[in-house]
């Protein structure tokens, strides 16, 4: 039976590091989460997941079935290292191959949404050519995703090219494809000079999930909840009033903390209290 509750998930990098997904999903369940978002970042270790064997993929599926904790989304940040906008043809080809493998992986294990990093390039200088190549790369990527019935969703970034929902909507209109949508990060959105509530309202109808974290201007990671600039309650209220009923994902990087689970519990309670005030979830 489908739950009527708003799904609340936790980012893989918030939990203890390791490759045993059964342990990770059991812990997430113990901590009260509905799902875990997988990370495929630019490290060789996490990139190697895209080359998992059939048995390794089945082990993940079996862990999901056994625990009842889903893995419905993937944060694909590997394109920092292999950007779709790269002027180096070999690097760009690697970026497209990573996209192909990620879409195939998602199709195999039941991941519905791949969150994309909105960088034309990250470690190089951007220009009109890198942006053109990025657009063309997205077009190729969405064609692959369409055939696999996997949604690609653009994150709102810590980078000027994609630092607002309005900018991401421009790409959605350009691609004009139901398999390309938006996955805003209310922390990143709030760290720039955006009218955050108007931006959230503008994205309704295209938002498939929401990242939840705190930020400060120029500081996009590891800001403790409540110490940054994000008006969480208003963001949750705006999304609820606009009709958004999809998942929220607490994004943290506590996997190397002395006690990751304790850090996650503290963040979970803080976020759920703000969601309850906004009427997004029932008060504890």
Curated annotation (Swiss-Prot):
Q: Which domain of life is it from?
A: Bacteria
* Listed GO MF terms: intramolecular oxidoreductase activity, interconverting aldoses and ketoses; L-ribulose-5-phosphate 3-epimerase activity
What SUPFAM superfamilies does this protein's entry cite?
Answer: Xylose isomerase-like (SSF51658)
- Keyword terms, alphabetized: Isomerase
What Enzyme Commission number(s) does the record list for this chain?
5.1.3.22
Q: What role does it play?
A: Catalyzes the isomerization of L-xylulose-5-phosphate to L-ribulose-5-phosphate. Is involved in the anaerobic L-ascorbate utilization.
Family designation:
Belongs to the L-ribulose-5-phosphate 3-epimerase family.
The name under which this protein is listed is: L-ribulose-5-phosphate 3-epimerase UlaE
The organism of origin for this protein: Shigella sonnei (strain Ss046)
């Amino acid at each position: 039976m489908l739950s009527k509750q708003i799904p609340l998930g936790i980012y893989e990098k918030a939990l203890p590091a390791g490759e045993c997904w059964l342990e990770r999903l059991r812990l997430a369940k113990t901590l009260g989460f509905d799902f875990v978002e997988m990370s495929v970042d630019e490290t060789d270790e996490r990139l190697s997941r895209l080359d998992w064997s059939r048995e390794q993929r089945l082990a993940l599926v079996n862990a999901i079935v056994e625990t009842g904790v889903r893995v419905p989304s993937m944060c694909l940040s590997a394109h920092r290292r292999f950007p779709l906008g790269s002027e180096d043809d070999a690097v760009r080809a690697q970026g497209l191959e990573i996209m192909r493998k990620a879409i195939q992986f998602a199709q195999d294990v039941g991941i519905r949404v791949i969150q994309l990093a909105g960088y034309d390039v990250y470690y190089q200088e951007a220009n009109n050519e890198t942006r053109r190549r990025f657009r063309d790369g997205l077009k190729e990527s969405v064609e692959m995703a369409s055939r696999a019935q996997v949604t690609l969703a653009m994150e709102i970034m810590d980078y000027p090219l994609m630092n607002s929902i309005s900018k991401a909507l421009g790409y959605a209109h350009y691609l004009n494809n139901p398999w390309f949508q938006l996955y805003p990060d209310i922390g990143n959105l709030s760290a720039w000079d955006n009218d955050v509530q108007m931006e959230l309202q503008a994205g309704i109808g295209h938002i498939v999930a929401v990242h939840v974290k705190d930020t400060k201007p120029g500081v996009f990671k590891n800001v403790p909840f409540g110490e940054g600039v994000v008006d969480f309650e208003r963001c949750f209220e705006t999304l609820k009033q606009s009709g958004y009923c999809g998942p929220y994902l607490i994004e943290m990087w506590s996997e190397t903390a002395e006690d990751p689970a304790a850090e996650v519990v503290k963040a979970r309670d803080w976020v759920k209290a703000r969601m309850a005030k906004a009427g997004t979830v029932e008060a504890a």
